[in-house]
């Protein structure tokens, strides 16, 4: 049964012993971030701050801070299940990763999850005058101010009319204006550019805060243009998402959201936003970004404010990223059958490092996979790609380091790309959004690749000895471990 709203998810977490109600008075200015940071790094529970200092609206944090809670959020036993459902729905073999996703979007099974319009919307129960009533966090000491960190930002393509839901942080400037930090690779920024090119004065925007977990995840997913995040949320939920019309803009929003902001962004207005302590572990420097002007605010009776804090990994966003890694792996395997597994390490902020294992069948195949990764959707922003054989567990860094140090010759097994598109938050780039890329071939080399020696066998015990020790291991283990 799909979660109707954020509140049902919170209730499920409490039933499962995964929620801590914090009854101490805690300030949304820095203090909540410190509590959440300590909690997530210790693998602790989701947090419901019941007494935010200076406010009467509770704050929900660390919702997705463990693998178990991420699975509870998406209602699956394995995160791969969603990708396997996507794959099984495909009726043709697409020519690219993005074509595969677009193909899913055209299927009857997927189309059955078109959002369901409703006039009865809890998100409209109360009209508010200003953002000032909400306990919006200042996360880190050098942040420029308070930031909305879990907004589902809804825009419409000026050319096609298709709606997009993305997630872009929003610095609060005052009670009626915020920044809109949509980076150049994001669909919100694409809609903004299209409106500017058409000569339009402004683009309408709606923001939903406190949505059900499938909708929040869908807003972060790397979907191509033309695939509705709300439909994808319905696909994940196995139930259509309820949406309602906004009051002052021509957009649809999740009907059961806790808070709705409506307004517009002018194409000719920019304002310096930041610094902000970001998921790379560094402060993003101040930069000019568009300004969101709020025309209408509504919320549910007794709303819950949903927030997150990002910073030096691991943080809560790690499991949103890991969900994407596992959900889209089946489609990546379909496009490139030699791929066995992939790991986007949390410490690499997901877009900085990809470790890929392959079943190697011909010379140069590792390099072929590197170029495939660099040509696939948002994976194209990956800074470093390491390719290993299928006998290496990509999620065990001890095995990965062993493979790199024993199967990689720096003089021969490196691919270096000249400056190419990179993530906007990569501070090592000399020029914003443009940096080199590194590929490391840590597979066993063949004679056809110029390796003139016999590759040595890996040291491992024979099966018969393992069988004998298995029979007595439980007794021995209790003595030695």
Curated annotation (Swiss-Prot):
Protein name, entry field: Uncharacterized protein AF_0209
Annotated Gene3D superfamilies: Single helix bin, UbiD C-terminal domain-like
Family of the protein in this entry: Belongs to the UbiD family.
Molecular functions per Gene Ontology: 3-octaprenyl-4-hydroxybenzoate carboxy-lyase activity
Domain of life according to the entry: Archaea
SUPFAM superfamilies with a match to the protein in the record: FMN-binding split barrel, UbiD C-terminal domain-like
Gene Ontology BP annotations: ubiquinone biosynthetic process
A GO-annotated cellular component: cytosol
Organism: Archaeoglobus fulgidus (strain ATCC 49558 / DSM 4304 / JCM 9628 / NBRC 100126 / VC-16)
Pfam families assigned: UbiD, UbiD_C, UbiD_N
InterPro entries listed in its UniProt record: HBDC, UbiD, UbiD-like_C, UbiD-like_N, UbiD_Rift_dom
């Amino acid at each position: 049964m799909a979660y109707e709203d954020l509140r049902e998810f919170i209730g499920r977490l409490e039933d499962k012993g995964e929620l801590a109600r914090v009854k101490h008075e805690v300030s949304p200015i820095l203090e909540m971030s410190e509590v959440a940071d300590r909690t997530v790094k210790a693998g602790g529970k989701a947090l419901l701050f019941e007494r935010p200092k200076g406010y009467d609206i509770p704050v929900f944090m660390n919702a997705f801070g463990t693998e178990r809670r991420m699975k509870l959020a998406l209602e699956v036993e394995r995160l791969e299940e969603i990708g396997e459902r996507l794959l099984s729905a495909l009726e043709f073999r697409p020519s690219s990763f993005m074509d595969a996703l677009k193909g899913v979007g055209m299927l009857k099974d997927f189309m059955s999850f078109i959002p369901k319009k409703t006039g009865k919307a809890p998100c409209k129960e109360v009209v508010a005058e200003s953002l000032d009533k909400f306990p919006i966090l200042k996360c880190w000491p050098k942040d420029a101010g308070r930031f909305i960190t879990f907004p589902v930002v809804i825009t419409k393509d000026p050319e096609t009319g298709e709606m997009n839901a993305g997630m872009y942080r929003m610095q609060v400037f005052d009670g009626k204006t915020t920044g809109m930090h949509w980076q150049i690779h994001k669909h919100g920024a694409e809609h903004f550019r299209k409106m500017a090119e058409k000569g339009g004065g402004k683009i309408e925007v709606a923001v939903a805060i406190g949505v059900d977990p499938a909708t929040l995840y869908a807003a972060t997913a790397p979907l191509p243009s033309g695939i509705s995040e709300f439909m994808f949320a319905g696909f994940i939920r196995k139930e259509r998402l309820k949406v309602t019309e906004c009051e002052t803009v021509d957009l649809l929003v999740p009907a059961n959201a806790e808070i709705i902001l409506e307004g517009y962004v002018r194409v000719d207005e920019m304002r310096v936003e930041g610094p902000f302590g970001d998921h790379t572990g560094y402060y993003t420097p101040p930069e000019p970004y568009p300004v969101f002007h709020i025309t209408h605010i509504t919320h549910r009776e007794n709303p819950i404010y949903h927030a997150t804090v990002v910073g030096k990994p691991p943080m809560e966003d790690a499991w949103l990223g890991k969900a994407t890694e596992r959900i889209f792996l089946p489609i990546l395997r379909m496009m490139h059958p030699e791929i066995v597994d992939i790991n986007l390490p949390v410490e690499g902020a997901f877009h900085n490092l990809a470790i890929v294992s392959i079943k190697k069948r011909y010379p140069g195949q590792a390099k072929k996979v590197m170029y495939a990764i660099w040509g696939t959707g948002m994976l194209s922003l990956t800074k470093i790609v390491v390719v290993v054989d299928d006998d290496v567990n990509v999620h065990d860094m001890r095995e990965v380091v062993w493979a790199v140090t024993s199967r990689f010759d720096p003089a021969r097994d490196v691919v270096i790309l000249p400056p190419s598109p990179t993530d906007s938050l990569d501070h090592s780039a000399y020029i914003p959004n443009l940096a080199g890329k590194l590929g490391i071939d840590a597979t066993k080399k063949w004679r056809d690749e110029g390796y003139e020696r016999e590759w040595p066998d890996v040291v491992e015990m024979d099966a018969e000895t393992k069988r004998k020790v298995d029979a007595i291991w439980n007794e021995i283990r209790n003595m030695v471990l």
